[in-house]
Structure formats: C-alpha cells, structure tokens
Amino acid sequence: MAKNISFTIKFWRQNGPKDAGHFDTHEMHDIPDDTSFLEMLDILNEELINEGKEPFVFDHDCRECICGMCSLYINGTPHGKTERGATTCQLYMRRFNDGDVITVEPWRSAAFPVIKDCMVDRNAFDKIIQAGGYTTIRTGQAQDANAILIPKEDADEAMDCASCIGCGACVAACKNGSAMLFVSSKVSQLALLPQGRVEAARRAKNMVMAMEELGFGNCTNTRACEAVCPKNETIANIARLNREFIKAKLAD
C-alpha cells in the first residue's frame, strides 16, 4: 500500500556555464511513495510557480528508460540508487525515507557545460558519433535477413552494445570524466559485425581523437562507469576499443 512521505530537496541552480551556481532548498510534503522522481520534480515546479518563483530546469523526454535525457546526479549517484538497468525516470520515491534530505545536481563534466540548473549540453556525444560512429557504405535495398551469416553470439553482443542510450552517466561517475564506456560501446556495436569491419580502423582512431579533443578524460579502469550504466554496458567494450585502436595505429 502506498504511503506519503515528506522530505527536504536541495536542487542546483545555475543560469549558465559561466555563472556561479548554488543550491536552493524546498520542503516537500505528503508525496506518495509510488510517485516517480520526475513526477516529484513536476510537483516541485508547480509549488515554485505558485510561490512566484522560477521553476527548476531539468532534462527529460520519454520517461520510459529509453531516451537517456533524464540526467540527474541524485544524492551523489548518477540517476540515483535505482534498480540495476534504470535511469532517473525509473526512480521512485519509495527508495527514499520520510525526513530525508535529497540533493539533486547536474552531470559534472567539463565536456557537458550547464545550460541552466540541471540541464547540460551533451552535444559532445553527438560530435563523437559524427566522427565515425556509423557506416558510410552504400548497401542499397534491404538484404535478406540471412544474406550475411553472423554468429548468434556476435549478433547478441552487438545488440547489447547498441543498447547504450548516451545518457552520460558513465562520464558523470568517472573521476576523470572519461567517455570511454560510451565510445567503446558505439565502436563495439559495429566492430562485432561484418558491415562495420570495413571502416573499423578509421572509426576507432577518429572517435578516440574526437573524445580527447572535446575535453573528456582518460580511462584508468576504476569501473565506476560500469557500476552506474543504466543499460549494463561493461568494460569489456573498453578492452575491445583499445584493441581496435592499437590495431589501427599499427596499420598506419
């Protein structure tokens, strides 16, 4: 049976990437514990507007754990302490206790500048994809499903890699602000398939170069990214990216 909880929420306020930020505090009362976290933020904004205050800005879209837009640092954890394989939108207030203090912050990364409050600019991920996360080969009309024989294990693993939604939790969790889990997942989803092998060397080099130029840090294998990934991507992808990159450089 659902119960109501009351708590204090501290949420980050910042007008832009070059402005100083601060925390605002608001008391929330009688919130049903079957309310989602984003629904709770909607209630917060209704209360702020009724008080004549500016609403709190945060990113969201599908609210179905698909799009990766809901990027919030909740009580020191990207997406909060959700079930394994879930984003902020799948976090429910039953995860919190009556009287808690809940702290909400944006992704903290030089490569993700703050647009306003907890909404950040993640165009850097798009630029990494533009650097090589695709195939340029003209394939014509759709082939028969069995025209190119691919082992089921490879197809399954490529699908797992492709499930990365680009939310940026890996970057937010990493002490170095590294995007290696994201980049390696996007490289792996193509490297595992014959259609992606033709441009594999160029793809690995260009995407790693773009990642470095955009201000992301280097990977030091702390595995924090793997622990918070809502789609359960693993550092096996990072190992594969390293192999692809080394092979590409040796072939130069």
Regions from the PLM with identified roles:
Residues N4-E27:
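Eukaryote-biased recognition of intrinsically disordered, low-complexity regulatory segments
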Residues W12, H29, I74-G76:
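Short strand-turn-strand beta-turns centered on an Asx-Gly dipeptide
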Residues D24-S36:
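Short, contiguous acidic and Ser/Thr-rich linear segments
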Residues T35-E54, I102-D252:
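Ferredoxin-type iron-sulfur electron-transfer modules in oxidoreductases and energy-metabolism complexes
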Residues K53-E54, M69, Y73:
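Long, hydrophobic/aromatic-enriched structural stretches that serve as scaffold segments
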Residues V57-M69:
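Short, structured protein-protein interaction patches enriched in aromatics and acidic/basic residues
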Residues I74-N97, V101-V104:
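Glycine-rich phosphate/adenylate-binding loop and adjacent beta-alpha elements
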